[in-house]
Amino acid sequence: MNYYSTSIAKLIEELSKLPGVGPKTAQRLAFFIINMPLEEVKSLSQAIIDAKEKIKYCRICYNITDTEVCNICSDKERDHSLICVVSHPMDVVAMEKIREYKGVYHVLHGVISPIEGVGPEDIKIKELLDRVKNGNVKEVILATNPDIEGEATAMYIAKLLKPLGIKVTRIAHGVPVGGDLEYTDVVTLSRALEGRREL
């Protein structure tokens, strides 16, 4: 039996599609939204539409941006000879929160996962190799998640980079196996970056 009007039921259904939002949270959010002033609801909807329509990928690092080149890649103060490779744009946010890393990034947009049908050609590995070959890169830090797929991806990339004579390191210490960088606290992530090891 459906206790809601069609429009509320539809809103709850759509909110339930968001990651980490179950039926009860979706219901709570839906009722919060319908009690918001109309102008705030319109502003929220417009912000979602704008983000979806205007966000693109940086042509250098593939992080999300609303310009051709992201703020990090266009920052002359950053060390462009140091590239930190991460799986997802949210990992860049996690790394930036520690305020210690002064290099640039490369976002893979996934990890190698044969079970999910994701191979090296499905993520931005070729683009990383092209960038390293064409740039003045001294070190690549592999900061994929410390789970099976993240480790496999890091080892695969390290194997491809070794012949190029570039220092390849892996973050270590404190990032739990099976954990996500996105949820790792700032101190742990900072120590992991400091304790990176060469591969």
Swiss-Prot record:
Domain of life: Bacteria
Keyword vocabulary terms for this entry: DNA damage, DNA recombination, DNA repair, Metal-binding, Zinc, Zinc-finger
Signal peptide feature range: none
Toprim domain sequence ranges: 81-176
MF term (GO), any: zinc ion binding
GO process terms (BP): DNA recombination; DNA repair
Entry-linked Gene3D superfamilies: 3.30.60.80, 3.40.1360.10, 6.10.250.240, RecR Domain 1
ZnF C4-type: positions: 58-73
UniProt-listed Pfam families: RecR_C, RecR_HhH, RecR_ZnF, Toprim_4
Family per similarity comment: Belongs to the RecR family.
Function: May play a role in DNA repair. It seems to be involved in an RecBC-independent recombinational process of DNA repair. It may act with RecF and RecO.
NCBIfam families: recR
Protein name as it appears in the record: Recombination protein RecR
Organism: Thermoanaerobacter sp. (strain X514)
Taxonomic lineage: Bacteria, Bacillati, Bacillota, Clostridia, Thermoanaerobacterales
